[in-house]
UniProtKB/Swiss-Prot annotation:
The chain crosses the membrane at residues 12-32, 36-56, 78-98, 111-131, 141-161, 177-197. It is a multi-pass membrane protein. This is Na(+)-translocating NADH-quinone reductase subunit E. Keywords: Cell inner membrane, Cell membrane, Ion transport, Membrane, NAD, Sodium, Sodium transport, Translocase, Transmembrane, Transmembrane helix, Transport, Ubiquinone. It catalyses: a ubiquinone + n Na(+)(in) + NADH + H(+) = a ubiquinol + n Na(+)(out) + NAD(+). GO terms for biological process: respiratory electron transport chain; sodium ion transport. GO terms for molecular function: oxidoreductase activity, acting on NAD(P)H, quinone or similar compound as acceptor. It is an enzyme of class 7 (translocase). Its EC number is 7.2.1.1.
Length: 199
């Protein structure tokens, strides 16, 4: 029995959130979540990459890399990681040019983190999970979009909490990343409550 698109989407956003369930993409999650505006921009960027890269990699895997896809008896699946990274690198370069042209302030704010999206583990993880679950092209698009929106929800929530924490009296030993890690852990516990949902 195949899952409905709504089930795949809700699972990707809430139940199997890339940042708060699998802890993927934590480098940018922690570094860019200081301001809601910046977190929103990065969240949109990651969502766009996931919505494009996951189904694109699905097509490449299904029609080229999978065993017997091109020729009977030929299995090119050992090339999947390097191929997926190549696709991500090309998409990130295109996205970087678009941001530099149309949103220069966001491009400047993201700075060094933009090229790192090529090997962003949440984006790469979504592609690997898509292959393992044998999603179709449309399911891959829904899953990639859901993963991106879930990651965006998590980073915006963290940024909002971090903005509020600026005005809090935090013990000296927990200031900085200490309280951020604790907050991420508590957010993760909150998202674990969705794991009981049967869709």
């Amino acid at each position: 029995m195949t899952e409905s698109y709504l089930t795949i989407f809700i699972r990707a956003v809430f139940v199997e959130n890339m940042a708060l369930n699998f802890f993927l993409g934590m480098c940018t999650f922690l570094a860019i979540s200081k301001k809601v505006e910046t977190a929103f921009g990065l969240g949109l960027t990651v969502t766009a990459l996931l919505a494009i890269a996951t189904p694109l990699n699905n097509l490449i895997y299904t029609y080229i890399l999978r065993e017997n896809a091109l020729i009977d008896g030929v299995d090119l699946s050992f090339l999947d990681f390097i191929t997926f990274i190549g696709v991500l690198a090309a998409l990130v370069q295109i996205l970087e040019m678009v941001l530099e042209r149309f949103l220069p302030s966001l491009h400047h704010t993201l700075g060094a983190f933009l090229p790192l999206l090529t090997i962003h583990c949440a984006i790469f993880g979504a592609t690997i999970f898509m292959v393992q679950r044998e999603y179709t092209f449309t399911e891959s698009f829904v899953y990639g979009t859901g993963c991106g929106l879930g990651w965006m929800l998590a980073i915006i929530s963290m940024a909002g909490l971090r903005e509020k924490m600026k005005y809090s009296n935090i013990p000296k030993g927990l200031q900085g990343l200490g309280i951020v890690f604790m907050t991420a852990g508590l957010m993760s516990l909150g998202f674990m409550s969705f794991s009981g949902i049967r869709l």
